[in-house]
Amino acid sequence: SFAFKVIACADKAVYLHDAVLSYRQDNENSSVNSSAKVFCVNAEYAEIERWIREDYARNHASDDVARMLKFNQVIKYDSYMWNYVRLAPEFYKEFLVQMTKEFQAALDAGDFSLDDLKPWKRANLAAILKDPEAWVDEHPHFATDGALGRAKYYASVGGPGVVAAFLVESLRG
């Protein structure tokens, strides 16, 4: 949440192509294998949302706050799917059930709409929102399928247009 807050408050920023932080997933005590750390990313995004609604809102117009809440949901989707892919399989259902609660609440509050997401992300989130536990059962290898496997999945939930958009984005790197 610190990085989000800094960027949200910055007048200017410089972006580097090189990664300066790497996540280790190679030991049995890493967060991917710890039930106590499954929801760390959720806690970070809860803090970001609290900060936007309480602190950021004090000094910014309501339109800016609404834009920031929408942006938060869009990047939260990416972070949550990254987290899902890195988790041990026994945590998939529990994580997606919580993810569904959070995104449904944001949709109900009008913080964002599915149309704010890219087509394949929209199709995926809509499928998860329908029944997160069934989604895991129907797509047990989503986390390990790679780009081609995910393209096949996106075709099943969103059709060829979604696949084309996904492939174009994937090729851009």
Where in this protein do the model-derived segments appear?
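Nucleotide-sugar-dependent glycosyltransferase catalytic core
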Residues: 3, 9-47, 59, 87-95
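Short glycine/serine- and small hydrophobic-enriched flexible loop segments
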Residues: 8, 47-50, 79-83
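Gram-positive cell-envelope targeting signals
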Residues: 10, 30-32, 45, 49, ...
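Short helix-capping and hinge/turn segments at secondary-structure transitions, especially at repeat
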Residues: 15, 50-58, 82
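Amphipathic alpha-helices of TPR/Sel1-like and other helical repeat/solenoid scaffolds
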Residues: 44-54, 99-103
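Flexible helix-coil transition and linker loops at the boundaries of alpha-helical arrays
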Residues: 54-69
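Amphipathic alpha-helical repeat scaffolds of TPR domains
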Residues: 68-82
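Membrane-interface aromatic/basic loop that binds lipid-linked glycans or pyrophosphate carriers
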Residues: 85-173
